[in-house]
């Protein structure tokens, strides 16, 4: 018997009545806590297949303190996150077209996109991306709030819809909150390690 293993079949098999990301030009900015896992899921949804292209953008390296909640592990320690994730995705799905840009996204040339994803969790950079890549380029912003209390996302599909800046302005006024009570301000780490917000790796895939 013949067993299908082509990219289109693998992307559509589990969601036969839904559209996939096959054939789309997608850029993922930030390959950290969220972006690492998200890039894996994007490929499983068809990104980088059937003529499409997935571009990973991150200038940061994978450090020892990242290992506990990152998609990558010790074999990629001290490697650039975008390059290491691209290598891992190609290992898992040899047919996909995945490119790494180990640079600050403000110096990157991403070209025309079908979807831009901001997974950096940095408010100021999110505002810059919204201004640089205006509608009609669809943009998905994803971030973790507090010590893993909530994972939020905002999809901008047109110029008249809600934008990232609007959401943050509402957030400062206490509107559109993810929780009824204020988010706790919890920090961990000391000495040479530096401070960080503690939450488990499972938060990144909620």
Model-derived features with residue positions:
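Residues at the starts of beta-strands that form the adenosine-phosphate
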Residues: 25, 53-54, 138
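Hydrophobic/small residue at the entry helix of a nucleotide-binding pocket
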Residues: 34
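A structured beta-alpha segment of the ubiquitous adenosine-cofactor-binding alpha/beta core
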Residues: 84-113, 120-124
């Amino acid at each position: 018997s013949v067993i299908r293993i082509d990219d289109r079949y693998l992307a559509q098999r589990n969601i036969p009545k839904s559209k996939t990301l096959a054939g789309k030009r997608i850029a993922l900015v930030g390959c950290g806590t969220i972006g690492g896992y998200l890039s894996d899921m994007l490929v499983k949804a068809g990104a980088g297949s059937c003529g499409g292209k997935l571009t990973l953008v991150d200038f940061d390296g994978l450090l020892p303190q990242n290992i506990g909640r990152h998609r990558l592990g010790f074999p990629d320690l001290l490697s650039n996150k975008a390059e290491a994730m691209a290598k891992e995705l190609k290992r898992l799905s040899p047919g996909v077209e995945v490119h790494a840009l180990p640079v600050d996204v403000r110096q990157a040339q991403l070209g025309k996109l079908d979807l831009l994803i901001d997974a950096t969790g940095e408010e100021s950079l999110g505002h810059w991306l919204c201004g640089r890549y205006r509608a009609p380029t669809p943009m998905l912003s994803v971030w973790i709030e507090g010590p893993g209390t909530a994972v939020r996302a905002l999809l901008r599909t047109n110029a008249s819809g809600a934008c990232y800046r609007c959401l943050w302005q509402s957030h400062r006024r206490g509107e559109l909150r993810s929780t009824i009570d204020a988010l706790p301000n919890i920090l961990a780490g000391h000495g040479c390690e530096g401070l960080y917000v503690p939450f488990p790796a499972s938060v990144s895939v909620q």
